[in-house]
């Protein structure tokens, strides 16, 4: 019997001589690479013959084993035929060996002698191992060889393909691996003595199988992948190789994203084949036990793990539902990818894990509770902190709606959540929310019509039906809620749901049809008999749910309108799709919102335009041409001016593409000509509008109906619908050149008479006249051969009409009082019309002159081109070049152009100013207009006249430079001071036109133009932003130093203005090298000096700095802003500069520049907010800094903190020194006053006597308190002037009794000087006894004095104009000298008190002697 075979670690290990000599090894291997091809082929044939001819166990023989080993060792070098022979021999022997295992088991039952059976089992086991080893080794070696070839040169790659094609390796590989998988699936327990196989054998197979799983190419082969999945499933499940398999699976999942789906397949197959989910459960629990923080670090692994869980939940929903609890804690982890995966898992489980209706009531109840818990988690995750998770939850809900797994009980809650997510700050969440609402509409259980009125009418009917069915005592009760009408899992029964849908589609369809606003009649709604009370209640509950859903969708319409203005293209596209779906289901407000998609046709984003065009086609273009025409003309009728421009753009595109067919055009003509019954004048006008739009791209459309346009457009129907005349004027301008000639020949004079009557007549309403006259004048200048002649006639006729009326009014005036106001309201209206007409004619005359010049130039070019071509032959080429050179030298080539330019300038100048001393017709009107506009008192009485007059004035200014210059002051006066915001707004727009036309004239008025940004009117500010944006972005105006005004508009209270300002700076940042970079320091300085709230300043700077992206600009800004510190001394500006610095993105160079500029801002570090901003910069710098830079930043931080503390200490010391200095001055003044007091005391001692006004200290005599009043009453002064206090020999004690501080010294002096009426107590020879014992704070000395002075002035008014100097009074308050003073040092206080005490004693002695 051969020795046992033991799986080696590597193939070459079989050549090593075993120590125990008790295993099979290769004793005499042959080097087949050294054999000649013929010898090698003979060698392989011999091995194959032995394997096939001899018994299966011959592979144990040493000779056969050595030869097979030799071939396997050098398998990659064998020719294809040899490879194929060897593989076939090994595979066929193993395939025959496997069925013999069953025969062994039968032999065990039949024979009594066990020894031969044991030998046979051993031989079978040995042969199985050897065949398995060699076959799997061949697979691994060949795959290794192929992989190495793929990574080498292109030539080697071609060789690989040749190898594979020559012997077709892939099918061989699949068959070999399937055979190995079969060997594991049969009963091997008899061979290995137990259900667990040999560890060495199983480990070898599993290890190599997982290695093959790492090759994506192998997994693409279905047969190979199936074999590998079977091997892994059998090993882990049947032979309990769980731990090692789980470790290998987790490694594969984390490292190879392509293997995730295949691993999930393998695990799911193992569970289904062996009805044992141990492998899946073990993997789930391993994932659940993993620390959530590990997934934060390994993002790729987290993504793969999440995908695996979702795939597993899809394949094994029931098993996953019972083990999902171990994964739920990961909802609290930081990895959003794992949370996304868990959300996906719950979605799969809700859809698939609870569909089984079998089981007892307790199991059903448990399943329902589990499902409800999962749904609650899904609802809760809609508010996840991560936008990716919120988006994924909404996607899961959409999948559940598609699979009809959302109950009606939850339907409205999900819809409400989704509608709320439409306002999410993340674009991906908004996209998912829009898709969810689209899906909910598409799969809603309430029917195809979701109009609120329909549901309300139906609901009311069934409530009445319920009241009839219920007993009388319950008739007044409310209908049950959703929960009462639902079954155990929160879903309304299918019967009731189907009934609801059928009723809503069938019986309610008639009530949903009216489109003209008719109320739904109760008679139109039939209520079918649906059964008993409970069924009726369930139906009512479902109708109420449908009503709430319809209201929820209708309430989201304003949000969808906002999303259509989003900067994200996906928002716009999906909002349009949702609106289209809403219109399909007749959601209230959807059609009105869809009208607002028209302006999006001008979007530069191609995807948005395509979405708009597709929506337009699907909504308005129908199969029936008449329906299409009716849809289009109704759209034209209801559209405003902006929408009509967009509609024209779309119609042109659709006509060019053929989407609007000729039959639709014919239907539009039928509507215009009233050939369709019931057509109104308004519909006729709408049809003509669409035809006019279509004619822009296809003018031939109008040629066949010229007479109809004149007859109907200006006929009796124009009286009914005045706008029809305006539309007809627009259509005339779209005529082709050929059609214009036809028109002039057939109906020219008639048409011009009609147009003249439109302009000069009075039959058009006031609100329509101006638009109609505009189009009529333009039409005249478009088709008339000499439009200036007709225009002259129109002006004269209009002028005579206006002033003839005035003369008639004057003739009829009899009294003096009636002459005060000649211009009646009728005359004002006519004058306004006249001014509009004459100014519009002047503008069209200017355009007409320019078009004539261009026409002459085109004709000249067209004429010169053939002559130039004929001269440019080879013979005349040299002569032509010589003539051209001579003409160029003489200037003859440019003389024609110069002549045309001169003629054009002269013609333009003659429009308003005239070419001679006498002014022309329009020039006379301009003079009158200029005087009229200066009559402010008249115009203030008639605002509508002022609007027309200023509009006309602006038009004349645009035409003529000299007229513009002479009236600029007037225009800016009106734009600043006019009470009407309409006038100011129009003039603001005109300033933009003037700046384009005459930039040099407007340049000195730049500041005044920027001032319009501060206007109180919203429309004026908005127009100012638009005008300035246009001028600056098109390089028509220099930014100058007023751009900060635009920056302030970023924080405007009106969102529209704020958005326009932001858009301006966004577009400005795209120009050149971003001008905002250069403007930012100036804007910062200007905003710092303005009275702008700190929050507004921060928002403005944050937005502006956010538009600067380049690192070099950021680095330069660091230096610029640091240098601004040295130029300002205000703490507020320091704070603003430092805040702006903190908004910058700091690179390594930026940090270094900040550190190098320390001297520039060190003086500002005393401010706490400045220091905080620098600390913010430091904290940001630490996050990205390298170790070397981080050390510098930390050192810089210490320096900042140190200087901040030093500056704070210096400020404190300076304040204390100032206090001390003021205290010293006060004490010195006390000493001087005491010395002054000594002189009168000494004179008294010599016998001069006591002054009548002198008093003794109140503390020495009790009767002294009332002395002042007594003496002042007895001896009043006759002097008119206030006596100097020095004459009274006393001082004002309240000035000497205070604690002083230098903090507010400057502020106090004016306050003292203002007390002119305050009496000096020295005048009466007394002091204020109340002030003698008062202790006051030195910080508020002056404030206290001023308060006392004010109170004294109220009590004792004085006629004195001058306040006496207290220093001249010869007395002080004795008690005040012993008070404590603040801010002084102890030694100085003692010296001062000693000095003061001697004077006190002298005063006391003098008082006692008296």
From Swiss-Prot:
Subunit (UniProt): Component of the condensin complex.
Compositional bias of kind Polar residues: 869-879, 1323-1339, 1368-1379
Primary gene name: CAP-D2
Biased composition (Basic and acidic residues): 469-480, 1208-1226
Description of what induces expression: Regulated in a cell cycle-dependent manner with an increase during G2 phase, highest levels in the middle of G2 and a drop during mitosis.
Record-linked Pfam families: Cnd1, Cnd1_N
InterPro entries hit by this protein: ARM-like (IPR011989), ARM-type_fold (IPR016024), CND1/NCAPD3 (IPR026971), Cnd1_C (IPR032682), Condensin_cplx_su1 (IPR007673), Condensin_cplx_su1_N (IPR024324)
Gene3D superfamilies: Leucine-rich Repeat Variant
Protein family (similarity comment): Belongs to the CND1 (condensin subunit 1) family.
Natural source organism: Arabidopsis thaliana (Mouse-ear cress)
Localization terms from the record: Chromosome; Nucleus
SUPFAM superfamilies in alphabetical order: ARM repeat
Keywords in alphabetical order: Cell cycle, Cell division, Chromosome, DNA condensation, Mitosis, Nucleus
Distribution of this protein across tissues and organs: Present in buds.
Example of a GO cellular component annotation carried by this entry: chromosome
Protein name: Condensin-1 complex subunit CAP-D2
